[in-house]
A protein has these predicted regions:
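Loop-helix junctions at membrane interfaces
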Residues: 1-172
Length: 172
C-alpha cells in the first residue's frame, strides 16, 4: 500500500522549475529511489493467466513504482504558463492544476495496478465482492487524494511566498 507524505513534492518543484522533461526525469529518479527503499509485488504464480504469471510482477513494478512517480512530472506542462504570468492568483491556479494533474495520473497508475493485480482483495477487507476496481479506487484514493491536497497546498505556499524555488536561477 501507499502512504501519505511529500513524495510528489520534489517532482512538482522540478517540473515547475525546469519544465516537462526535467519533471518526468525527476519522477523517474524518484521511482528508483522509492524502489531502493523496498518494493512489494504479488507473486506471479498466484495468477490464473499465464501471461500474468510471467509478466505480472514486472508490470506491477512498472505501474506502482516507475510510471506512478514518473507521470507526476507531467505537472511540468503548466511550467511555462506559470512562469509567464505576473498574477499571484493565476500562479496559484497553475500550481493547483499541475499538482492535481500529476497527482491524478499517479493515482490512475495505482488504481490500474490494483484493479489488475489485487483481484478479489476487496471482499477480504471491506466486503466489496468481486470488484477489484472499486476496491482499488477506494483504497488508493484513501492516500493518493490526501497526497494531492497536501502537496498542492505546499506548492501554493511556495508560489505565494517562496516563488524563487519554482524558478531556475537564470531567470530573474
Amino acid at each position: 500500500g501507499g502512504s501519505i507524505g511529500f513524495g510528489m513534492l520534489p517532482i512538482l518543484v522540478i517540473a515547475y522549475r525546469r519544465g516537462l522533461l526535467p519533471g518526468i526525469i525527476c519522477g523517474f529518479i524518484v521511482s528508483i529511489i522509492q524502489m531502493l527503499g523496498g518494493i512489494y509485488v504479488i507473486n506471479g504464480s498466484s495468477f490464473d493467466n499465464s501471461f500474468l504469471q510471467v509478466m505480472g510482477p514486472f508490470l506491477q513494478i512498472m505501474l506502482d513504482y516507475v510510471l506512478a512517480y514518473t507521470v507526476v512530472g507531467f505537472a511540468g506542462v503548466f511550467s511555462k504558463t506559470f512562469k509567464n504570468t505576473d498574477s499571484k492568483g493565476k500562479k496559484v491556479c497553475y500550481v493547483i492544476l499541475g499538482s492535481a494533474f500529476g497527482g491524478l495520473l499517479k493515482y490512475a497508475c495505482h488504481v490500474i495496478a490494483g484493479g489488475v493485480f489485487w483481484l478479489n482483495q476487496g471482499s477480504s477487507f471491506w466486503g466489496i465482492n468481486d470488484d477489484s476496481w472499486l476496491y482499488s479506487f477506494i483504497y488508493n484514493g484513501a492516500y493518493c487524494i490526501p497526497n494531492i491536497i497536501i502537496c498542492g497546498a505546499v506548492m501554493v505556499i511556495f508560489a505565494l511566498y517562496y516563488d524563487k524555488l519554482l524558478f531556475p536561477n537564470d531567470i530573474s
